[in-house]
Amino acid sequence: MDENPEFAAIEQARDLVIDSIAETMDLYGITRSVGILYGTMYMRDEMTLDEMREELQMSKPSMSTGVKKLQDLNVVKKTFHRGIRKHTFVAEKDFFKFFTNFFPPKWEREVQVNVTAIEEAQADLQKVLCKEDLDEDIKNEALQLYDQLESSKAYYDWLKRLAESVQTGEIFKFIPVETK
């Protein structure tokens, strides 16, 4: 039986967007398979794990793991329907909400990891700089590194404030959403 060409064109358009969503998520450290899962859920309404597994031909444990990852990122929600035993899940369809849920935690983690490392490194450098009879070349190298680390703190302060402004929605005062 021949497939309806219009239906095939719709499916091709849907697959094109799913693939681009998966590729974009891969750029930000989310596996391609989880990106395909999100893209598929984005294109559909609520889905059960069985429906996801059937559509994507992946194992149920893989589906569960992928959905859990997307829930942890706060871009997929479990939905409740009285009288239905199977859980259904729905993807966040508003990309602005997706953005405000997805990026700030990553930025906050970057700030936390790097500021902690900088503070530890600067403490170690202070110990080196406090030594008497310190070789001038070593002192200069330690000072140069200390200053470089100190100047990088401005970036992490800015990134922390950016994360906060995205989470609170304040960023949209400066870069408003234009509806088309």
UniProtKB/Swiss-Prot annotation:
InterPro entries in alphabetical order: HTH-GbsR_regulator, MJ1563, WH-like_DNA-bd_sf, WH_DNA-bd_sf
DNA-binding region per UniProt: 49-73
Molecular-function annotations in GO: DNA binding
Keyword check for Metal-binding: no
Notes on activation and inhibition: Intracellular choline sensor. Binding to choline induces conformational changes and relieves the repressing effects of GbsR on expression.
Gene3D superfamilies attached to this UniProt entry: Winged helix-like DNA-binding domain superfamily/Winged helix DNA-binding domain (1.10.10.10)
Highest taxon in the source lineage: Bacteria
Keyword Lipoprotein: no
SUPFAM superfamilies (UniProt xref): Winged helix' DNA-binding domain
NCBIfam families referenced in this protein's UniProt entry, alphabetically: choline_R_CudC
Family indicated by similarity: Belongs to the GbsR family.
Function comment: Negatively regulates the expression of the gbsAB and opuB operons. Required to control expression of these genes in response to choline availability. Also required to down-regulate glycine betaine production once cellular adjustment to high osmolarity has been achieved.
Protein name, entry field: HTH-type transcriptional repressor GbsR
Organism (species): Bacillus subtilis (strain 168)
